[in-house]
Swiss-Prot record:
This is 3-hydroxyanthranilate 3,4-dioxygenase. Its EC number is 1.13.11.6. Disulfide bonds: none annotated. Belongs to the 3-HAO family. It catalyses: 3-hydroxyanthranilate + O2 = (2Z,4Z)-2-amino-3-carboxymuconate 6-semialdehyde. Keywords: Dioxygenase, Iron, Metal-binding, Oxidoreductase, Pyridine nucleotide biosynthesis. Gene3D superfamilies: Jelly Rolls. GO terms for molecular function: 3-hydroxyanthranilate 3,4-dioxygenase activity; ferrous iron binding. PANTHER family: 3-HYDROXYANTHRANILATE 3,4-DIOXYGENASE. Its cofactor is Fe(2+).
Length: 189
């Protein structure tokens, strides 16, 4: 029998059942294979956030249960792209996006390559009122599950002055995603 480095076929339904507790807040996601050149991650809802991911490579989204959406950011402008159950989206490199999963028990399969040495991801927080970048941090991303929480904590722990918008002076609400989204809704309508 051939030695398959990543094992024999995986029963995805059984894997989902076995990891159901990891696909809910506060964890919300789980990487399937740890030592592959591909990061194959299942992300569960509910999960709302106010950061935007700048991925240097393509990112594939397959929304296989429930609905979600991506909030895109470019040059201070926002756009919403809905991901309905059954939808797939291949996102081009450097498309700043903020996945929003408001539905409980929603599930999305996210597939992306591990980054080549020296190629970093970035995460930025921008002002909901005017779209100006408030903070941006680069990271060498090896594991979505392990590498992101410290980055978020760094932003959340930053002072109000460090979260003050250089464009309009509004203070980013940090962990209060709902306040950020309410402000965005007021300024987008």
């Amino acid at each position: 029998m051939f030695d398959l480095k990543y094992g024999r076929p995986l029963n995805f339904k059984r894997w989902l059942d076995d990891h159901a507790d990891k696909l809910k807040p506060p964890v919300g996601n789980q990487q399937i294979w740890q030592d592959s050149d591909m990061m194959v991650t299942v992300v569960g809802g509910p999960n709302e956030r106010s950061d935007f991911h700048d991925d240097p490579i393509e990112e594939l989204f397959y929304q296989f249960k429930g609905n979600a959406y991506l909030l895109l950011w470019e040059d201070g402008r926002y756009e919403r792209v809905d991901l309905r159950e059954g939808d797939m989206l291949l996102l081009p490199p450097h498309t700043l996006h903020s996945p929003q999963r408001p539905e409980a028990d929603s599930r999305c399969l996210v597939v992306e390559r591990k980054r080549p040495q020296g190629q970093n991801d970035a995460f930025q927080w921008s002002c909901a009122s005017c779209g100006t970048i408030v903070q941006r941090h680069e990271v060498t991303l090896q594991s979505i599950v392990a590498d992101l929480p410290p980055l978020y904590e760094k932003f959340y722990a930053s002072s109000e002055d460090a979260r003050r918008c250089p464009g309009c002076g509004e203070i980013h609400p940090g962990r209060d995603f709902q306040a950020w989204h309410r402000t965005l809704a007021r300024h987008s309508s």
